[in-house]
Amino acid sequence: MEIAVQCQNPTTDNSDCVVVGIYEGGILSPAATLVDLASGGALRALLDTGDFTGDCGDTQLLYQVPGMAAARVLVLGLGSHGKVKDSQFRKAALAAARALQGARVGRASLHLLDTPVIRRSAPACAKILVQAVADAEYHFDRHKKPADAPQRPISELQLSISENDTAALAELQGAVAEAQATARAVAWTRDMANEPGNICTPTWLAEQAEAMAGRLGIKSTILGPDAMEALGMHLLLGVAHGSRQPPRLIILEYRGGAENQAPIVLVGKGITFDAGGISLKPADKMDEMKYDMCGGASALAAIQAAAELQLPLNIVTVVPASENLPDGQATKPGDIHRSMNGLSVEVVNTDAEGRLILADTLTYVERFEPDVVIDMATLTGACIIALGHQTAAVMGNHEGLVHDLIAAGKESMDRVWELPLFEEYQEQLKSPVADLSNVGGRPAGTITAACFLSRFTENYRWAHLDIAGVAWKSGEHKGATGRPVPLLVEYLLRRARQVA
């Protein structure tokens, strides 16, 4: 989909469809006012019928409106004037995109940047529009017959503003470029995560990462079991023992910054299918455990976006990829493995495997002498109980890093909430037979999982994102969401501005 920003009067816009907004109470946006005047009151007539009220997300498609160059006008409800929140603006944008799809519109022009959104600039609103349209356009249908695959009608999207301000246009075009890179990264993440476990194996995921890296000039290195054994990554290998698919450690290095710039390291959990191992999961919804590699896919996609935007940063992404299956050679509850950093771990529950593969990886990344390390993982069901499906959890050993991630999440509408990592929680990880246990019981499960990881991050600034509640959706709209890619890209953009 091609996206452009232009100064355009909606009445002379010759797109297939022009989109304008109306607020509750019949208040017309500036663009809608121009349409109403040119048409001799067509929008006022619509309001007089009572069929359209301006509620947020309401849509009404009008054909052959007098005085309009476009064949169609989509009227979009924006909610209460002066009180439009970013979440409402996104809801309206999604509704508009779906209405355009339903009308099979090829070229659409959105005259919505005149909408005052609380605490959001015009460039921020442009990003919301682009990402909302991209989300509405996304379909994962590669395994369906062509006749069953939904069409993607929008080929050209124009964001229109009323004033021909060169500086404003340039700023908006920059925001659109960032939003498009983010949207492509989100789509890549969703594509990887939506593939079934018989396709998305650790080896396949590594191959996809290598292909992406090759396209963008990113250095890629893939380690197998022999290299892991030589490094002493026995926690990662212990998780992989139950699978016939060999594990992979995927390492991508993007060097856009100065040679002496310490890298930002992204670590993502890459369990391509998680049956729980010997601590077998219930059958209900076990199919969704293909999404247990969403953290890994997100970390890979974030470096893709950084490379596309040519950010002046050094970034390293490391993804431990494995399956977690039951087998005669699988790790058993009570087994003890020694981690790469020398700590012995009693594996009380083999379904708490994500923290094991992350622990060895967090030790491995010390060799990059990182500025910061951010890991992301669908780690605990307890996080869903605590925060639901709207917000991810963030914890870490550096207050500034945690706050930076919270700010990036707020700006990108990919929000996170901080949970504590008080030292007292470490008591729950004590083991009578090893240096620590891989589980800390039911209380504060999300926190104790992060406490476990913290034992392997003492030599650098670190933050952990538990994305278990936000990485995918169940039910009718089942599928990966692409989170926390928007947060990660926004964080990297902010870091890049600091360098510039």
Curated annotation (Swiss-Prot):
Keywords associated with the record: Aminopeptidase, Cytoplasm, Hydrolase, Manganese, Metal-binding, Protease
Cofactor or coenzyme needed: Mn(2+)
InterPro entries: Leucine_aapep/pepB, Macro_dom-like, Peptidase_M17_C, Peptidase_M17_leu_NH2_pept, Peptidase_M17_N
SUPFAM superfamilies: Macro domain-like (SSF52949), Zn-dependent exopeptidases (SSF53187)
Enzyme Commission number(s) from the entry: 3.4.11.1, 3.4.11.10
A Pfam match: Peptidase_M17_N
Functional summary from the UniProt entry: Presumably involved in the processing and regular turnover of intracellular proteins. Catalyzes the removal of unsubstituted N-terminal amino acids from various peptides.
Family: Belongs to the peptidase M17 family.
The protein's name in its UniProt record: Probable cytosol aminopeptidase
Organism annotation: Acidithiobacillus ferrooxidans (strain ATCC 23270 / DSM 14882 / CIP 104768 / NCIMB 8455)
Lineage, uppermost ranks: Bacteria, Pseudomonadati, Pseudomonadota, Acidithiobacillia, Acidithiobacillales
